[in-house]
């Protein structure tokens, strides 16, 4: 429930100095107090503190890929999961002394794997007598001190998030998540940890949590009218001086926001999506920022604050528990308080250690339940469908997603005023490793096509708007001159556009001329064999992320909504396969778009 002034103060347990103290840990000094130097001058008191950080865990406890039913592996041979992180954390605590360390997270915790999905939807933590979320159990056992709220925390709705918050032994922080009516904090903005030293003078470490303002777009259906999300810079400027005035010696921000200064949603919001470096540059008083959201590995990135001239150290530990950030703080006792003398950061790779059996043993039953669930056979397929080339070729696997979406929307609009309009469909290649085999098909194989918690909508668009939509999508390809060699590995993701922000639209035929400048690449655009009529109206089956403005595609966010569904598209596809019993690939697979250069096909 949103915090009011009274219960906020009660929950932060303010002291006489007005400082929120959420626990105390003892410490061993980096340099003992004593006499040294000429004249018996007393040495300065120094202390070393290490703050560890994770981010974007996305439901990963085990080093396991539920979609492939095997241990996780990628081209870089990364490992994933909190069980691996727990081993690293244990090693750091053994080296530094547990009392000299803290452990925090920068958000996106409860969405992303079939494990997290199972305990949100199949055996939900919100049910009567429901289970404790596996991520809460693991993080509690490891001993987290605080975690920021990520945007994907809202994917399953606020009740699920609140239940997860209740199950955690550590606070969830989000200074820029406000109750829509009172504009008071909807979560705890910060926590201050008191770290005890043998000098009798505690170090007060403030952790400020900031989430992503894009939640207002991406999870509009779950948060509209309930919460608002102002900018990171604005809220950091409000809270950091307060934390310093409360006596914080160290200020760390856990920010679910990348460091690039860019926004995938363009000018739809006045707040920057990836604002961590801007916060460091413009808000004085911050010592370090644990960065999240961007799924990037940043061992150490130093930003000079424009007002104070001091350097702020940023670090982002990639994603999924693949890395653990270590911030090492050197503190010195000066002028009656602890001062930060030095800060450095680095990351540890979780593929260098074994899983902590304490964590795997704690959740092995939950893991086995989910493995059994995803391996249920739900139908058959007449042919293999693979996404390996789906980013640059029209493939049956994307056609399948679009076929199910279009059929679902047509059925939903039957008997309405728009039932006679042609239905098109939008889909992206979310995973290039997704594959559906010929023969028996399981839940995990179908679920692997759609790893996100998106839901389906129907939007009304004109031919001209669809043309602009496709042109925007085609920016994804690197401009390649006619006759030049083509390397598929280097052909896509121009301007750092991720695969999920490149859309294929089924129901139309078109070519993408990658020899042309972005904005003029769509050629031979037609509908049912005739040039597309700019004035004609169409229904577009589209996911809620795109319909809400995700990716900043033109027109769709402001278009008329004809229908919306609360069921995840993944489950819609699974339900379709269960109902049909078989996937007849020949019934929907066709090549309707292709890449060209001056009219010559690239492939």
What are these regions (language model features)?
Residues 202-204, 386, 509, 531:
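Short, solvent-exposed loop/turn motifs
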Residues 2-19, 26-352, 397-407, 415-416, ...:
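Acidic, metal/ion-coordinating pockets
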Residues 55, 197, 212, 259, ...:
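Short, flexible loop/turn elements at secondary-structure junctions
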Residues 42-50, 60, 73, 80, ...:
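Feature captures C-terminal
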Residues 364-375:
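Acidic, glycine-rich low-complexity/disordered segments
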Residues 376-394:
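Glycine-rich phosphate/diphosphate-binding loops and the adjacent beta-loop-alpha structural elements
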């Amino acid at each position: 429930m949103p915090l009011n002034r009274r219960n906020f103060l009660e929950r932060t347990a303010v002291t006489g100095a007005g400082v929120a103290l959420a626990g105390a840990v003892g410490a061993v000094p980096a340099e003992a107090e004593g006499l040294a130097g000429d004249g018996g001058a007393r040495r300065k008191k120094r202390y070393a503190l290490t703050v560890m950080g994770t981010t974007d865990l996305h439901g990963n406890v085990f080093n396991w890929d539920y979609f492939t039913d095997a241990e996780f592996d990628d081209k870089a041979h990364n490992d994933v999961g909190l069980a691996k992180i727990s081993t690293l954390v244990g090693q750091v605590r053994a080296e530094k002394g547990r009392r000299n360390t803290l452990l925090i997270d920068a958000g996106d915790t409860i969405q992303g794997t079939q494990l997290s999905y199972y305990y949100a939807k199949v055996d939900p933590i919100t049910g009567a007598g429901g289970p404790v979320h596996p991520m809460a159990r693991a993080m509690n056992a490891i001993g987290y001190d605080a975690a920021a709220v990520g945007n994907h925390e809202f994917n399953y709705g606020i009740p699920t998030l609140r239940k997860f918050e209740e199950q955690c032994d550590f606070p969830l922080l989000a200074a820029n998540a406000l109750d829509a009516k009172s504009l008071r904090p909807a979560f705890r903005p910060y926590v201050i940890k008191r770290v005890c030293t043998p000098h009798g003078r505690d170090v007060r470490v403030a952790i400020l949590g900031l989430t992503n303002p894009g939640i207002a777009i991406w999870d509009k259906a779950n948060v509209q009218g309930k919460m608002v999300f102002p900018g990171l810079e604005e809220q950091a400027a409000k809270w950091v001086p307060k934390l310093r005035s409360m006596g914080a010696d160290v200020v760390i921000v856990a920010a679910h926001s990348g460091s690039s200064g860019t926004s995938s949603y363009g000018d739809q919001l006045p707040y920057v999506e990836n604002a961590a470096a801007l916060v460091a540059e413009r808000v004085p008083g911050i010592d370090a920022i644990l960065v999240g959201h961007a799924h990037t590995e940043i061992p150490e990135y130093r930003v000079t604050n424009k007002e104070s001239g001091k350097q702020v150290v940023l670090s982002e530990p990639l994603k999924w528990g693949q890395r653990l950030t270590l911030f090492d703080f050197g503190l010195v006792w000066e002028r009656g308080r602890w001062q930060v003398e030095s800060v450095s950061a680095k990351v540890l790779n979780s593929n260098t250690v074994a899983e902590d059996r304490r964590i795997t043993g704690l959740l092995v039953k939950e893991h086995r339940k989910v493995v059994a669930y995803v391996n249920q056979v739900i139908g058959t397929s007449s042919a293999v469908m693979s996404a390996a080339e789906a980013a640059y070729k029209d493939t049956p696997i994307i056609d399948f997603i679009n076929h199910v979406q279009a059929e679902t929307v047509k059925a939903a609009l039957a008997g309405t005023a728009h039932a006679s309009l042609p239905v098109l469909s939008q889909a992206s290649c979310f995973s290039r490793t997704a594959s559906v085999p010929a023969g028996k098909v399981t839940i995990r194989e179908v679920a692997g096509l759609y790893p996100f918690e998106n839901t389906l909508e129907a939007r009304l668009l004109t031919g001209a708007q669809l043309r602009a939509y496709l042109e925007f999508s085609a920016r994804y390809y690197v401009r390649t001159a006619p006759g030049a060699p083509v390397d598929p590995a280097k052909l896509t993701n121009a301007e750092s556009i991720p695969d999920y922000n490149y859309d294929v639209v089924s129901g139309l035929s078109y070519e993408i001329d990658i020899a042309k400048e972005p904005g003029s690449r769509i050629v031979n655009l037609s509908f049912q064999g005739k040039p597309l009529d700019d004035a004609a109206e169409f229904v577009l089956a589209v996911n809620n992320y795109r319909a809400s403005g995700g990716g900043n595609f033109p027109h769709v966010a402001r278009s008329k909504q004809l229908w919306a569904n609360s069921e995840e598209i993944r489950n819609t596809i699974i339900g379709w396969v269960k109902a049909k019993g078989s996937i007849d690939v020949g019934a929907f697979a066709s090549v309707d778009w292709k890449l060209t250069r001056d009219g010559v096909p690239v492939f």
